């Protein structure tokens, strides 16, 4: 459990010491210093104390229980293209043995990564997740060269700010439609079903909005993975 006001250090390959959380991947190569960052799709926030290429230190805004395999969101971060290429090549080599025909690409920032992977694996279906500021800026070309587009509303809102989420979704969906690419809407579509038997009115309205912006697929995750009902 992380307590309100507790100072936590995040980093890749850190030593096992108190108040340290090891990340599975390195921190972003470039970043615009942000006063706050968050985890778990923006649910829990930290005030930034120190941010370098190797460590991120923050003060927790609230008390909460830290669960494994939750994402870290640092607004306005830019990820290294070469590191992304290496990461996905390693994943695809492993998946290729399992005869998997599609792969989701997180934090796609431009179409270069897509063309690079398509050249090496032309038959592989690439699902590009547009979920940060650079990906949103280049979403037209990302939509043009991808096979499928996914909007991760949780990561996207945590990266660009809640106030920009609505217009960002419209922009991405318009470009997906422009190039005739299937659109997946993900994150918190029926989140209350992780605790309740029936969806709320907000859930229903959210699904209606996803339909209006031409979503072809509604993706459920926590709603079905951790339901207590």
Describe the residue ranges of each PLM region.
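Non-catalytic helical/linker scaffolds that mediate oligomerization, partner binding
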Residues: 1-229
């Amino acid at each position: 459990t992380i307590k309100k006001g507790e100072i936590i250090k995040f980093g890749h390959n850190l030593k096992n010491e108190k108040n340290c959380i090891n990340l599975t991947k390195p921190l972003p190569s470039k970043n615009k210093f942000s006063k706050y960052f968050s985890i778990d799709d923006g649910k829990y926030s930290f005030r930034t104390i120190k941010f370098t290429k190797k460590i991120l230190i923050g003060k927790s805004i609230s008390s909460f229980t830290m669960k494994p395999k939750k994402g870290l969101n640092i607004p306005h971060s830019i990820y290294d293209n070469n590191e992304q290429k290496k990461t996905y090549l390693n994943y695809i080599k492993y998946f290729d043995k399992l005869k998997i025909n599609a792969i989701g690409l997180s934090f796609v920032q431009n179409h270069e990564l897509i063309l690079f992977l398509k050249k090496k694996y032309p038959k592989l279906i690439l699902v590009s997740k547009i979920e940060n500021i650079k990906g949103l800026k280049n979403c037209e070309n990302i939509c043009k060269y991808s096979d499928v587009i996914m909007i991760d509303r949780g990561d996207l809102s945590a990266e660009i700010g809640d106030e920009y989420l609505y217009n960002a979704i419209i922009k991405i969906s318009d470009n997906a439609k422009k190039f005739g690419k299937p659109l997946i809407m993900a994150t918190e579509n029926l989140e209350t079903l992780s605790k309740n038997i029936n969806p709320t009115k907000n859930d229903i309205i959210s699904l209606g909005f996803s339909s209006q912006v031409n979503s072809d697929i509604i993706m459920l995750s926590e709603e079905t993975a951790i339901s207590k009902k």
